[in-house]
Amino acid sequence: MTNPVLNPALPATAAAPVAATPSAVGSAGIVAPVFLRFDEPLPLASGQTLDGYELAIETYGTLNAQRTNAVLVCHALNASHHVAGVSADNPKDVGWWDNMVGPGKPVDTNRYFVIGVNNLGSCFGSTGPASINPATGRPWGAAFPVLTVEDWVRAQARVADHFGIERFAAVMGGSLGGMQALSWAITCPQRVANCVVVASTPRLSAQNIGFNEVARRAIITDPDFHGGDYYAHGTVPGRGLSVARMIGHITYLSDDDMAEKFGRTRREPAADGAYRYGYDVEFEVESYLRYQGEKFSRYFDANTYLLITRALDYFDPARATGGDLARALAPATADFLLVSFSTDWRFPPERSREMVRALLKNGSPVTYAEIDAPHGHDAFLLDDARYHAVVRGYYERIARELGLNGAVAPEGNPA
């Protein structure tokens, strides 16, 4: 077991968990991250080694004395460890899955101890390309190692070790987070009792890899990118990152959802309805995408975008078994819940059905729900009653099996 330490150089607000004091019914309360430092080298799939690193985490609920009620939530591309509750630093910063995690919510923190981990390579507190490379004293930039989903799982396992958690009650995630949950079930089968995979896939299609490549090229060809070392130049490849986000955002929405939100509505049309016959914003959808792109470029790191999209491309557990997904999933001993959404064309329901068929072939216990929802891939983030009922029911079954009926008895500060 590795022995992480809390970073003593960080502000006091980040040196220890802030108790989640609910500010409203169903809220996980005001939360702040903990920064764990790991000095044990982490071997990576690329053959490189990361000698030391920090991971930003948040926790919700209380770890029981038996350490059996822990749930790991894995995040998608542009999310972070801030899964639920309200940030202590910004009252407007609500966790990205706050409708899913909290007291009385589908993942009920009166019963479960939930951990959110910001992945290596991200830009929200964990070690990544913008961090200082101890060998040079400068930001890593493009020299930061390329990572895989499996690398993230190995790093997350050390967080579990830190808390003394031998086996998670569940590991769950949506989209890229679902890939991490699946990887946990394959690579650490003895440590996962339940695997919850939402709006995900066992591998990216050529189309998805193509979208990622176009987004990366937008960033890399931005004159302000400087080969990934833009930190030293005091620039940000904001134009490229904005375009990358615009491309990605289109893939997260369904055609029907975009038609309902925007249709062909014009932005400030002329009184006579004539076109402007120019290349500035003409339609509402253009304005929306530009806004999303520009907002994203102000808070996300371009090198992180490159790194995470490449990790998405590389994920393919069946690659090691000649394309046989059932064989790739054979080590898994967990029970599974898979959820897909009817209008998700980024990771369509057929990809979830493929995983279900492979699991059934192996005799794995699996529950599958395909939710009829109009919102495309982003439906996994929304408060859909049918979707949440499925997840709630699954976690209630886990709670019954573990004897978690109501709030757990505190053991003390687990960190």
UniProtKB/Swiss-Prot annotation:
Question: PANTHER family recorded for this chain?
Answer: HOMOSERINE O-ACETYLTRANSFERASE
GO cellular component labels: cytoplasm
**Key word Cell membrane present in the record?**
no
Please explain the role this protein plays, according to its UniProt record.
Transfers a succinyl group from succinyl-CoA to L-homoserine, forming succinyl-L-homoserine.
| Similarity comment text for this entry | Belongs to the AB hydrolase superfamily. MetX family.
Where in the cell? Answer: Cytoplasm
Q: Which HAMAP family does the protein's record reference?
A: MetX_acyltransf
Gene Ontology terms for molecular function: homoserine O-acetyltransferase activity; homoserine O-succinyltransferase activity
Q: Which SUPFAM superfamilies match?
A: alpha/beta-Hydrolases
Please identify the protein, giving its name as recorded. Answer: Homoserine O-succinyltransferase
Which reaction(s) does its UniProt entry say it catalyses? L-homoserine + succinyl-CoA = O-succinyl-L-homoserine + CoA
Which amino acid positions bind substrate, per UniProt? 245, 378
UniProt keywords, alphabetically: Acyltransferase, Amino-acid biosynthesis, Cytoplasm, Methionine biosynthesis, Transferase
Q: What is its EC number?
A: 2.3.1.46
A Pfam family that the UniProt record links to this protein: Abhydrolase_1
Q: Does the keyword Cytoplasm apply?
A: yes
> Catalytic residues?
175 (nucleophile), 344, 377
Describe the subunit structure. Homodimer.
Gene that specifies this protein: metXS
Q: Which GO terms describe its biological process?
A: homoserine metabolic process; methionine biosynthetic process
Instruction: Pinpoint the site Important for acyl-CoA specificity.
Output: 346
